Amino acid sequence: MEAIKGSDVNVPDAVFAWMLDGRGGVKPLENTDVIDEAHPCWLHLNYVHHESAQWLATTPLLPNNVRDALAGESTRPRVSRLGEGTLITLRCINGSTDERPDQLVAMRVYMDGRLIVSTRQRKVLALDDVVSDLEEGTGPTDCGGWLVDVCDALTDHSSEFIEQLHDKIIDLEDNLLDQQIPPRGFLALLRKQLIVMRRYMAPQRDVYARLASERLPWMSDDQRRRMQDIADRLGRGLDEIDACIARTGVMADEIAQVMQENLARRTYTMSLMAMVFLPSTFLTGLFGVNLGGIPGGGWQFGFSIFCILLVVLIGGVALWLHRSKWL
């Protein structure tokens, strides 16, 4: 595999262009640098930037079908071997405060033993962990180690978000035990986030498993074992997602039952009130017809006695309902 000149991959508006020093650190790429397997280059681009897009479209270092993939529309996670290189599409939790975490960020990577080209539009928060390690001199030393560390960071962020969703479900279940119904749309959003995570993390787990099983020349056996561990860890997260989705279904039924019971209780209360006041309403309506004059209208105690009779009647009906165990 021939060496690459630094000037061939030094894109002016790149997010960064670094050379791995082989000892866990990096240094900025210069035009005079020689890129080889001992000192691979990591070129990170925002594909909507003009010069980055132009470099992706014209560089001879990338196969033709890779150019479109690195700057194309977002797809589900996948991995494809293209000659000596490998094209990988991954998804990351969205760390932007203006958007929901489940609006996942796509990152595309083309790499071989010498060159790592990664592209994105929105910031990939998980890469900050890898960048910090490289700046401190404790990062990966080669392309295989870089890929394992990136996948590990992506899985860490996904696991943290899955754990947050799990905690929300536990709180929601505790509130339901106290007959506290969540705000409208809360459970639907929670379920949607779980489904979105399930949709993208399942193929991402398959990507990790395939990378662990492929005999890529720039990955060692130890790195393949680490990649398999990452795939297994994400698989456990998927099992947690499946359990959470099932629990949200149970909670939806429980919420519907609680709301139905509340409605039935209110309807029952209104029916009892109607039964209590129905006799008094009948009498007041009957007396209020006034076709032949109001009975007792000329007697000074007529209205008082009528009110007392109504109170006694209402009390009698209430007592009968109580003894009948309707109240």
From Swiss-Prot:
Chief site of localization: membrane
Ranges facing Periplasmic side: 295-300
CDD domains: ZntB-like_1
Keyword Transport: yes
Membrane topology according to the record: Multi-pass membrane protein
Function summary: Zinc transporter. Acts as a Zn(2+):proton symporter, which likely mediates zinc ion uptake.
Family listed: Belongs to the CorA metal ion transporter (MIT) (TC 1.A.35) family.
Any one GO molecular function term: cobalt ion binding
Name recorded for this polypeptide: Zinc transport protein ZntB
Origin: domain of life: Bacteria
Keyword check for NADP: no
Gene (UniProt): zntB
Catalytic activity: Zn(2+)(out) + H(+)(out) = Zn(2+)(in) + H(+)(in)
Compartments where located: Cell inner membrane
Pfam families: CorA (PF01544)
One GO cellular component, as annotated: plasma membrane
Transmembrane segments annotated in the record for this chain: 274-294, 301-321
Residue ranges annotated as Cytoplasmic topological domain: 1-273, 322-327
Keywords of this entry: Cell inner membrane, Cell membrane, Ion transport, Membrane, Transmembrane, Transmembrane helix, Transport, Zinc
InterPro entries in the record: CorA_cytoplasmic_dom, CorA_TM1_TM2, MgTranspt_CorA/ZnTranspt_ZntB, Zn_transp_ZntB
